[in-house]
Amino acid sequence: IEEYLEYITYYIKDGKEYTNNERGKKRKLSALKSFYNYFFCMEIISSNPAALVPLPKLHEKEIVRLDVDEVAILLDQVEDGTKLTKSQLKYHNKTKIRDVALLTLLLGTGIRVSECVGLDINDVDFKNNGIKIRRKGGYETVIYFSEEVSEALHDYLEKRHHIIPLEGHENAFFLSIQNRRITVRAVENLVKKYASTVTSLKKITPHKLRSTYGTTLYQETGDIYLVA
């Protein structure tokens, strides 16, 4: 059994390479243990060697997120751009209001980047401070936001009204510098650009901003179900 576990760590079958991490090996060993246990209980075999093999321990990955001070520094960096390169600064004045709104929205609501880029102008309700988003699976839901998020979105929308979008992108809330609906990749690069000026020890992605939001929400409410 131990040789089997060593084998499935990396093997080639029908010309294809296969690997299994700790989680994959634990899943396969659990199935093997159940198989042996059944035959042992049915007295088909006289011993159960699988019972002597411990399940692999899963090493939990550290959750990477920004702390409160880093969030403040991140948003300050988006506004002033003091640590950006010369080439990045060329576009900074054109995009900083949009970038502040986008990052404030991600940090303030915990929505996915795909949900963020999919926002249309009519999806934002400033009267009730809510946005209508489309979740995985196609269903719609309303997420509410704070006054801070509302102010950032208002500032961007005021500028957005003076931009003429390309045909087919008229309804998009967030636009790229090419006046198209901004893409997931563009937001990922945007987050990476600003986050690198705040911390070089953490690899911050839009998903990590969701972790930051979730952690903050849990610390404020103590309700894990709200975070989920």
Region roles according to the model:
Residues 1-228:
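Conserved catalytic core of the tyrosine transesterase superfamily
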